[in-house]
Amino acid sequence: MPKHYRPAGKKKEGNAAKYITRTKAVKYLQISLATFRKLCILKGVFPRDPKKKVEGNHKTYYHMKDIAFLAHDPLIEKFREIKVHRKKVKKAFAKKNKDLADRLLNRPPTYKLDRLILERYPTFVDALRDLDDCLTMVHLFAALPAVEGERVQVQRIHNCRRLSHEWQAYISRTHSLRKTFISVKGIYYQAEVQGQKITWLTPHALQQVLTDDVDFNVMLTFLEFYETLLGFINFKLYHSINVNYPPVLDPRLEALASELYALCRYMSSGRVPGNSEPAGLIEDKEGEDNKESSKTDESELRLAQLQHQLPTNEPGALMHLVQESTAADADDADAKECRSLFKNLKFYLSREVPRESLLFIIPAFGGTVSWEGEGAPFDETDEDITHQIVDRPTQSHVFLSREYVQPQWIYDCVNARIILPTEGYIVGRVPPPHLSPFVDNDAEGYIPEYAETIKRLQAAAQSQVLPLPSLGDEDMENSLVEAIIDRSESNEIADKKRKLEMLEKQYHDELRMEYEGKTFSNRTADNQPDVVDKSDTKEADDHMEDSHKQAEKDAADISKTLMSRKQRGLLQAIEINQERKKDKVNLLKKRKKNADSSASAKGR
Amino acid sequence: PRNPSPSRRSAAAAVVQGEACVEIAATMMAEEGTQQLPYVRETVLKKRKVNEDWAVKNRERKAAKRQRRRDDGKGAIKRPEDFVREFRNKELDFVRMKTRLKVRKLPPAETLNSKLVFAIRIPGTMDLHPHMRRILRKLRLTQVLTGVFLKATDATMKRLLVVEPFITYGFPNLKNVKDLIYKKGRGFLDKEPFPLTSNDLIEKALGEYGIICLEDLVHEIASVGPHFREASNFLMPFKLKCPERRLQMKKKPFKDGGDSGNREDKINELIEKLN
């Protein structure tokens, strides 16, 4: 019962008035449990955990304001309409009235979730922050089959496939991809869009088997919401780079199973604004330009629109656009590094490599890519190809002008941000370990061997930039100057440290001699007193060590005593975590040692 | 996962749980000095158990549903009129088949648009003449809404003409070939079907013909290569999904406004509806 209804003799206050159990909430809303679950998912309502559970610990509690929030939503009425419509159809079929059933099925009640997206994400950045789960779910369903038993519809799977390809095309076009990692579950990607890091997981391009342990109703409700969300985000992102949305693909490329390439081609051709832009976008731009002035006359608006349409006829319009895009892109050094990683490289993908993933990654880092089959931009016999990605034990024909590498080389180059040497990735060879870019090795305390190698290669690549002062780029000059300053400072610090160490050593030696109270002349004179002196020295050293340990322990105890109980517990938790981490690192080192010893044994 | 939730809340719950674990572990170590015992919250264990119970019940419920559907067909009373009608339908189908073979002249297989044919069994009557039933079994189209890839030869086209009222076929494009094999393909190895979730099984079955991965299989089927027969026999018939609104599936030929027979390139639209 809500709080506002108070029958005589029954008052509710405190948690009893604030929280409501699930059964009572379902009764209050007068919908079924399945519809209640669906509504909670769409509106973002989740159970609460009150400290005092009025009706027992075993029940699920919802906040009363959340339930009122659901009660006032138009969706609840729409769901009731859908239920009534389904009953009507069932009744018509039962009465063998096929005409009525067909008429009812032709006009089903539908609903849209656009209002919910605007309600839950007031600004665009809020939507981008919540995009990880959305992208993972959409990419998962794009790879699932439409099986008869489940309620996964064919149209929904096609929609997910289209949305995922559109998202990948945008990331590839704007060079926003930052990290990739191949795992057993699938391929992880991380992109940076408008300052937000977005990470998602794509299943491998193999068949997915649906298990019966999964409740697809809940997943389909989430998917319904996420499809709408990704549609909105794609719309806004595409318009931010002056491309029409939804895109119109080349039907020939679509028929040849090359949707991602068709999307990239569409984005390249659709770059020019002007006639292709809708009028609303022009008005939006006008609004942005005239923020200062509170009034806008019709004549001024018309004149501005004409001025905007004018540059499409001038020859310098494209140069202006290029300059604008260059200026905008110059802000982000990370994006600049990513866009030029694979520049001037030309890739050809063999049939057996994961084509969709590499078609997404290689253009995102500035490379040119082709594959086997119709609709590909160039053929295998092109002499300009620099790398061919293969994963097959034998090759039909080997061209001497290119390198044959395994697909892992691409992912490792992307994570290292440099072109790695290809010796380790040649066909037929076991590639180096594929390291996760999401792990911070310094924080973990264990740096794998290959990570060390990559660091060295990165340092070498950085040092190659130093002897190029002739470039006129300001960013390059600044980075060069900073590099020089850092190098000189580090040299000075190293020198100072070395001197200090030498001085400290001398001081320690002199102190020890003074403590012993002996000189070289005394030592040479007597032999038997030397033995006695040595034993005395040992005892003295032991005493010194004991005193040192005691001093350290006393200091620690004093500091612990000064802490409060909460701080002491926190310190103990921190120590336990550090101990656990050390154990993990030791386990890794032990494994590595065992692997090395077994490898050497095999070598014999 | 039964209730997938945004990862932020999961992370928050994990953090809270971790803190609880750490606190209790610290207390135990402070008191007893023994090794830390594993700790999982009671509600988490309950939720896990409920999920497992739900999975078991769900499996049983689905099996019972399938059994019930299978039992519905048994025990039905058939009247003599049904037998008579069935026999007459068989005879009529046979006569129509012979007439169709006599009247219709097939163009040579080389003049067709493509060498690859995808045939789908459409819903139809149970009253099949034994001759047609035998040919459908040879084409492996014994179940409704299943499909197979075939090579467009004169013999194959003649067989398809014989069973035309019960199938529809056409020339698929590369996109649909790829979609069908990637999503619905099932291999047949050691007298047992298995899903194509790994390249090792494909290499084990077809490695001697140079087909070592899923993409090789797609290429062989799409281009009708020299080992098309082995590749096609390796793939089980594809089970397609019934659309929301049931197709009318009239027995008239497609060019006459029905649903059976040769659709040529329009088969792609149908495949996109069913896959």
From Swiss-Prot, chain A:
The keyword Amino-acid biosynthesis does not apply. It comes from the Eukaryota. GO terms for biological process: maturation of 5.8S rRNA from tricistronic rRNA transcript (SSU-rRNA, 5.8S rRNA, LSU-rRNA); maturation of LSU-rRNA from tricistronic rRNA transcript (SSU-rRNA, 5.8S rRNA, LSU-rRNA); regulation of rRNA processing. It is found in: Nucleus, Nucleolus; Nucleus, Nucleoplasm. The keyword Acetylation does not apply. SMART domains: BRCT (SM00292). CDD domains: BRCT_pescadillo_like. Disulfide bonds: none annotated. Keywords: Nucleus, Ribosome biogenesis, rRNA processing. One of its GO terms (cellular component) is nucleoplasm. Residues 282-299, 531-557, 577-586 have a biased composition (Basic and acidic residues). GO terms for molecular function: mRNA binding; ribonucleoprotein complex binding; RNA binding. Residues 275-299, 518-557, 574-604 are annotated as: Disordered. Residues 337-427 form the BRCT domain. Belongs to the pescadillo family. Required for maturation of ribosomal RNAs and formation of the large ribosomal subunit. This is Pescadillo homolog. It comes from Oryza sativa subsp. japonica (Rice). The gene is PES.
